[in-house]
Amino acid sequence: MMQGWSRIRLVAALAAGFAIVSAPARSEDRVVNFYNWSNYMAPDVLANFTKETGIKVVYDTFDANETLETRLLAGKSGYDVVVPTAYFLQRQITAHIFQKLDKSKLPNLANAWPMVTQHLSTYDPGNLYAANYMWGTTGIGYNVKMAQKILGPDARIDSWDIVFKPENLAKFKDCGVHMLDSADDIFPAALGYLGLDPNSTKQADLEKAADLVSKIRPYVRKFHSSEYLSALATGEICLVVGWSGDVMQARSRAAEAKNGVEIGYAIPEEGAQMFFDNLAIPADAQHVAEAYELINYLYRPDVAAKNSNFLSYANGNLASQKLIDPKILNDKNIYPNETTLSKLFVITARDPATQRIINRLWTRVKTGR
C-alpha cells in the first residue's frame, strides 16, 4: 500500500519526536525496525512509544504484500516487526519466516478479541506467530455528490454491479476511477460476483475473473494501493475499489479540509473480502526484546483505540472498544454488524503455481496484453 518517506513526511516525523535512524545505532542504543503499510499509524503513537521506553523507531512503509514478502524471503530484511496480511502470513509461516511469539512477553494480548483471533487461527493455527493489528474489508469508496449526479439522487452504490458492469463504470470514467493494485483483492471480488468461489484455484475460474476485470479496464484511471486515499479526499477521483479504513480516512481528510467533498463507503450486497493485518517478528530479527515491547505497546487498549480513531479501521483489541469514538464503533462499514459479517468472506493462501497464474493474469489485466 513500497512507499518511502517523502521530505514532508520525514520532517513531520522528526517534528513529532520519534527517531528515523539513518546511521548504525551505537551498541548502547535501543532500536526497533518497523515495516508497516502506508498510512497505517496514528501520527503520535510511535513518538509516544519512544518517549515512554527510550527505544528509537526506524519506520519504513510498503504498499503491497508482495513487497514485504520479497524482503522477508530474501533474508536479512533488517526488520524486527512487520505487518503481513493473513493470507500471506499463512504461507510465510510454512516458509519459517517468523519466530513463534513468546506470549509471556506480551501481557497485553489478554485484550485480544476472540472473534478476531478465531478468524486469524485459520491462517495461524493456535495463534502462535502473529497478533492482529487492524482488520477491515475491501469495498467501494465513492464521492457521494458525483455518484448522485451520475446515477441520480436515489443511487445505490452497494453492489458490485457498479464496478463490474462496463456500462455502469463507464459513467464514472471522466471523474476518475482507481482500483487496488492487488489481484488478491480484485480477483476474489470478481469471482464472487460471477457466483464462483472467491477462493477458487481453478485456472478456468481465474481466467473468467481476469476477463471480467479486463472488460472494465478501459474505465480505470489507475491501479494503485495507496494513492487513492488522497485522490478521493481532494475530489481528484470519484470511485475506488479500496480498503475500508483508507476510504474512511479520505472521508475524514475531506471533512477537515472543508472542501465540499463528501465520501461514502459501501460493502457490496453480493459479499466482500474481510482481511486481517497482523504484527509478527521475523526469524532473523536483531532487536527481539524491543520488538516485543513495541507489539505489547500497540496492544494497550488506549493505543489501539488511538490508532482506530485515526485510521478508521477496526482492531483486534476488544478492550479498546470502550475508548473508540462511538461514530467509528457504531459504523457498520468499520465494525460490521452480524448481518454484514454474514456477507463477508476470507481468502486463504494459494500454492505457488496458482499464485504465478494469478500474477500473470493480473499483469495481463493491467497492461491490456
Task: Specify the residue positions occupied by each region the protein language model found.
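Bacterial N-terminal signal peptides
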Residues: 9-21
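Early extracytoplasmic/lumenal segment of secretory-pathway proteins
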Residues: 28-92
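A structural signal for short loop-to-beta-strand junctions that line the ligand-binding cleft
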Residues: 77-81, 99-145
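Ligand-binding pocket segment of bilobal, Venus flytrap-like solute-binding proteins
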Residues: 171, 175-264
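Sec/Tat signal peptide C-region and signal peptidase I cleavage site
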Residues: 21-27
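Conserved C-terminal helix/tail region of periplasmic/extracytoplasmic solute-binding proteins
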Residues: 230, 338-369
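Short beta-strand->loop
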Residues: 99-110, 161, 257-273, 282-284
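Mature extracytoplasmic/periplasmic domains
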Residues: 277, 282-343
